[in-house]
Amino acid sequence: WATSSGIISDGSKGEEIKVTRLGRRLFGEHGHDPYMEDPATSWIVHWHLCGRPGRTTWFWAFSHLPTLSFDRDTLVQGLLGLASDRGWPRVAPTTVKRDVECFLRTYSSRWRSAASLSHEEELESPLVELGLIKPVGKKDGFRMVRGPKTTLGDGVFAFALLDFWGQYSRANTLSLEAIAHEPGSPGRVFLLDEDDLVERLSGIEDITDGALTWSKTAGLKQVIRVRSVSAKQAEQMVEFDFPVRSKREAA
């Protein structure tokens, strides 16, 4: 979980396993949220889980699932179909089912009766509080909740936008359509519609200190990159969403 959330490096390139810069910023001795009590931290973790194709179930569910309402079998069959289309060897249905169970427990408070859960499984995921997936109707029915996200701060949104942009394109402009609909985009991962995005993007210049600007010239809605922003600078933008600790440290 820590490596998938970008909190520690996995040592896959021969490097030692260690806490990342983002991990220190959030959970270090002087971190913004060492006990993971602020929703901003949960949004950052969610972004790292679902904004990258490496976590297949998480990425596919938010970026490729064709409907907001679904059941467990819909996810399982969709992922098995993906594995077949990509020619991935040895993808067992039981493995996919376990992955889907883990995914649903990450975001939904209703899963199975308490009697059937282990002690570890009884602990509710902090991402449930984001309200992204709600149980509906029948036992295995769920719905992704698209719309405004009041607990998603502008700092985390700006960080996610820059992170997505860095993976998606080297161009100095990024269209609203891409931000809203491309796989791994803020619109997909945060379940924001275009109106929600426009409202947030209208203030992107202030959050990024002029590095990005929002433009609607000649009906073309896009973000313009005025100057480059490093990965470290992008991470620093999440600090906008931790005002209490920031003010205390400043004092």
Question: Where in the sequence are the language-model features?
Answer:
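Donor-sugar nucleotide-binding helix/loop cap in glycosyltransferases
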Residues: 1-251
